[in-house]
């Protein structure tokens, strides 16, 4: 049984706690927030036995094996270091950190401490993603030539202040674009060789629209993310003999396979569910088997993504 503690008592942590409850070999036993009242309220609502008004007290709990970090992006680096120094395995929300240097530092420390560390890129673990990857491996669309993905919605800067605050790690790339950036190369098992991008910025300075072109080893990927306009949240993988469509790419349950005549010849749908379950199951499996990183979501993926996002966000 793997016992989890949660740092950050927000909505996404609630989804994580629900996912853990669906597993027989994991349990959330504590939550910490900078506000003791918030932690107490959250723990009562989620039926969590222990709560703390600071992170250090949670990390001092000897029963906790692993920590799920659900704080804002700007806090991730320090939170991860604190957890690893306390001897806890770590699952941290995306984006894991904000630079390649930070990514290298936390990944190296995790290995030095013999601890598991993973970015919570849950889309990689969804059954529809696994299905699409298998179709590609089987050659059902032929050689992949192009991948495209868009993800965007019109965010309210007043209601969604965090998304537009550079001090909190806001911006569309950290919040939305990270999904296709880390999932599309995974589908074809290829490294990103080159990149160019265009960035539009909000008055606060964060990116609110990004368009990227990625040169992979044998194909090209285009992706766009935005807080300024609603976009179809779909991904397409185009091969020489057909294509795959992933509706609602980062959270949906469906994959569709089309031939060159634009006919749907196969499909998969896992149904509506809490998609975090597959990610958490992988974390538990890795910890129980002594793995320091997941083969599905390895450290190098996080390091590469951190390097690219940093390069994009420094464009003017």
Language-model-detected regions and their locations in the chain:
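Rossmann-fold dehydrogenase core element
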Residues: 105-122, 143-145
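Active-site loop of classical SDR/Rossmann-like NAD(P)-dependent oxidoreductases
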Residues: 268-281, 297
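Contiguous beta-strand/loop segments that form the cofactor/metal-binding neighborhood of enzyme cores
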Residues: 181-254, 281-289
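Hydrophobic residues in well-ordered beta-strands that form the structural core
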Residues: 52, 92, 117-119, 246
């Amino acid at each position: 049984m793997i016992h989890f503690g949660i740092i950050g008592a927000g909505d996404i942590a609630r989804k994580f706690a629900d996912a853990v409850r669906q597993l027989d070999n994991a349990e959330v036993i504590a939550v910490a927030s900078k506000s003791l009242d918030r932690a107490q309220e959250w723990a009562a609502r989620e039926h969590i036995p222990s709560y703390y008004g600071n992170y250090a007290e949670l990390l001092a709990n000897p029963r906790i094996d692993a920590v799920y970090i659900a704080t804002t992006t700007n806090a991730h680096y320090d939170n991860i270091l604190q957890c690893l120094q306390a001897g806890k395995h770590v699952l941290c929300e995306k984006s894991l950190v904000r630079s390649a240097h930070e990514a290298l530092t936390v990944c190296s420390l995790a290995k030095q401490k013999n601890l598991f560390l993973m970015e919570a890129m849950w889309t990689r673990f969804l059954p529809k993603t696994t299905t699409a990857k298998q179709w590609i491996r089987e050659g059902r669309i032929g050689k992949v030539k192009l991948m495209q993905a868009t993800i965007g919605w019109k965010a309210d800067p007043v209601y969604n202040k965090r998304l537009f605050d550079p001090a909190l790690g806001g911006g569309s790339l950290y919040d939305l674009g990270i999904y296709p950036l880390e999932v599309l190369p995974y589908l074809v098992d290829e490294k990103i060789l080159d990149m160019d991008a265009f960035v539009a910025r909000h008055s606060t300075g964060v990116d609110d629209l990004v368009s990227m072109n990625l040169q992979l080893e044998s194909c090209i990927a285009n992706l766009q993310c935005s807080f300024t306009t609603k976009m179809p949240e779909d991904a397409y993988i185009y091969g020489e003999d057909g294509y795959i469509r992933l509706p609602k790419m980062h959270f949906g349950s469906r994959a569709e396979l089309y031939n060159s005549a634009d006919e749907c010849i196969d499909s998969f749908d896992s149904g509506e569910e809490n998609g975090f379950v597959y990610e958490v199951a992988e974390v538990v499996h890795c910890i129980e088997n002594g793995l320091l990183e997941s083969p599905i979501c390895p450290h190098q993926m996080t390091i590469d993504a951190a390097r690219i996002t940093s390069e994009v966000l420094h464009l003017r």
